[in-house]
């Protein structure tokens, strides 16, 4: 089994094969990907769809001297297998194993780290120009999906690439007619037999946005209007960018891919190759339902993914989806917005029930936030469902277009904290710090499912921008209450009181997901625990009260310490004039790799045992007692 694949330890081995051996190799590679992912979990549909393209690229181009940048990067398992990591695939996305995305530190063939979408063309162009300036003769290749091509950054790069006439840069559009969620809007119309409608329309919109402000391109603007009316063949659009357009060709036909790439290899200047592929290619279950098989856990390939027979705890994403439907039922002003994450953000049911109030704007986080701001000015109640890591992409819009105008937009921030197998690129570690400094913002962190529901309801009542953050995955098992209860603004609650004598009284100020492990630590130490609820405005009165009645304060959050929720408590403490030693616990100043979330939190000292250990070492050992007594005497 895998007789050919076992002979490939790097692309040089691949290039020694006869052309007639490549299709059998592709069959083995596809089977190996399916077998590997079924054992570890990971991205499947996209990787089954890029097998032939990956083989062709490494066969024709002299990698790693020629650079390949994979947009998003979740489709790179065939690439990893062919570049020396075949025998490490059992560790894919596991702790201390190989990443599910390209990483420069992992292999010289991973020329640029990716995981967020639409960055590849910019990176490849930068590499091409850098190689030019260094006197190196190499190709830089960006492989980008049709969903990622809808983002503005891709068109900004295309516009820039077009003026670099001698740069050896190749953009490959992997047109598989699907991003994670089905593409939307005008981008879904077909203009030609195999030409992706959403890509063409997005290209038109992107060119207009990038170029319309420049007086010299009025003629181009007129040509764009002609494109829209179907008066000019679609390929001309790419030529207006300065690219030589080739395609579309079958992305699963090596006899088409290889000669085409060999011809392109001899050309100079920006090239654009349009290939058509199918997600899930070669595995009928994934072909039939590429969304279900986009990122499965472990499963039996012979049987496919089976529904779980054991009742699962409700996920926070499900809590959000149910809440949004309930609010929309009560109030016709409620609208839901997602940047291409309908399934991931729990909005499938909302779309079915409230289609006229559901807006999937595509991979366009910047637009999503400003779009919501515009809706708010018209009296609507927009709710933006977005992952913490993707909100980073719309930071200017959050400040300039929403907060500065104090518009009542609700941000439902999913995947806050560590996310596990997707690793550092998707960690929601920074949202508290980057939002807390923005005037007019209200920020809440949910400790359980019902609190998440009530916080979301509270957010919808606010006259200003408000964010509720919650983690990936299942909650604590707390049932949600159907009736809504508005939480008093900026007020936390004490969950547990210490019975320790003066000198040993510890108060733990916990935020969101850290309430449960803090309670576990408090049982061991007999400490007070406060569920702070609000990061902004932080409950300054509660901070002062706890400081006045305790000897030591500890803040705990599942986010970066610098500038985070703990910092808000320290600032409130300084304002109160009550001086107490404070220990701030949170995620370390590191990019935390992929792994099991519970194990990663334990390694960060953010489980019950770790929190108790940190408190003991800082405050409750003999040296701390002596220091505390000396401070009190002074």
Curated annotation (Swiss-Prot):
<dbReference type="Pfam" id="PF02780">
    <property type="entry name" value="Transketolase_C"/>
</dbReference>
<dbReference type="InterPro" id="IPR005475">
    <property type="entry name" value="Transketolase-like_Pyr-bd"/>
</dbReference>
<comment type="similarity">
    <text>Belongs to the transketolase family. DXPS subfamily.</text>
</comment>
<dbReference type="GO" id="GO:0009228">
    <property type="term" value="P:thiamine biosynthetic process"/>
</dbReference>
<keyword id="KW-0460">Magnesium</keyword>
<feature type="binding site">
    <location>
        <position position="176"/>
    </location>
    <ligand>
        <name>Mg(2+)</name>
    </ligand>
</feature>
<keyword id="KW-0414">Isoprene biosynthesis</keyword>
<comment type="subunit">
    <text>Homodimer.</text>
</comment>
<dbReference type="GO" id="GO:0005829">
    <property type="term" value="C:cytosol"/>
</dbReference>
<dbReference type="InterPro" id="IPR029061">
    <property type="entry name" value="THDP-binding"/>
</dbReference>
<keyword id="KW-0784">Thiamine biosynthesis</keyword>
<feature type="binding site">
    <location>
        <position position="176"/>
    </location>
    <ligand>
        <name>thiamine diphosphate</name>
    </ligand>
</feature>
<keyword id="KW-0479">Metal-binding</keyword>
<dbReference type="Pfam" id="PF13292">
    <property type="entry name" value="DXP_synthase_N"/>
</dbReference>
<dbReference type="Pfam" id="PF02779">
    <property type="entry name" value="Transket_pyr"/>
</dbReference>
<dbReference type="InterPro" id="IPR009014">
    <property type="entry name" value="Transketo_C/PFOR_II"/>
</dbReference>
<dbReference type="GO" id="GO:0052865">
    <property type="term" value="P:1-deoxy-D-xylulose 5-phosphate biosynthetic process"/>
</dbReference>
<dbReference type="GO" id="GO:0016114">
    <property type="term" value="P:terpenoid biosynthetic process"/>
</dbReference>
<dbReference type="InterPro" id="IPR020826">
    <property type="entry name" value="Transketolase_BS"/>
</dbReference>
<protein>
    <recommendedName>
        <fullName>1-deoxy-D-xylulose-5-phosphate synthase</fullName>
        <ecNumber>2.2.1.7</ecNumber>
    </recommendedName>
</protein>
<dbReference type="InterPro" id="IPR049557">
    <property type="entry name" value="Transketolase_CS"/>
</dbReference>
<dbReference type="GO" id="GO:0030976">
    <property type="term" value="F:thiamine pyrophosphate binding"/>
</dbReference>
<comment type="pathway">
    <text>Metabolic intermediate biosynthesis; 1-deoxy-D-xylulose 5-phosphate biosynthesis; 1-deoxy-D-xylulose 5-phosphate from D-glyceraldehyde 3-phosphate and pyruvate: step 1/1.</text>
</comment>
<keyword id="KW-0786">Thiamine pyrophosphate</keyword>
<feature type="binding site">
    <location>
        <begin position="147"/>
        <end position="148"/>
    </location>
    <ligand>
        <name>thiamine diphosphate</name>
    </ligand>
</feature>
<dbReference type="InterPro" id="IPR005477">
    <property type="entry name" value="Dxylulose-5-P_synthase"/>
</dbReference>
<comment type="function">
    <text>Catalyzes the acyloin condensation reaction between C atoms 2 and 3 of pyruvate and glyceraldehyde 3-phosphate to yield 1-deoxy-D-xylulose-5-phosphate (DXP).</text>
</comment>
<feature type="binding site">
    <location>
        <position position="365"/>
    </location>
    <ligand>
        <name>thiamine diphosphate</name>
    </ligand>
</feature>
<feature type="binding site">
    <location>
        <begin position="115"/>
        <end position="117"/>
    </location>
    <ligand>
        <name>thiamine diphosphate</name>
    </ligand>
</feature>
<dbReference type="GO" id="GO:0000287">
    <property type="term" value="F:magnesium ion binding"/>
</dbReference>
<dbReference type="InterPro" id="IPR033248">
    <property type="entry name" value="Transketolase_C"/>
</dbReference>
<keyword id="KW-0808">Transferase</keyword>
<dbReference type="GO" id="GO:0019288">
    <property type="term" value="P:isopentenyl diphosphate biosynthetic process, methylerythritol 4-phosphate pathway"/>
</dbReference>
<dbReference type="GO" id="GO:0008661">
    <property type="term" value="F:1-deoxy-D-xylulose-5-phosphate synthase activity"/>
</dbReference>
<feature type="binding site">
    <location>
        <position position="146"/>
    </location>
    <ligand>
        <name>Mg(2+)</name>
    </ligand>
</feature>
<feature type="binding site">
    <location>
        <position position="74"/>
    </location>
    <ligand>
        <name>thiamine diphosphate</name>
    </ligand>
</feature>
<feature type="binding site">
    <location>
        <position position="283"/>
    </location>
    <ligand>
        <name>thiamine diphosphate</name>
    </ligand>
</feature>
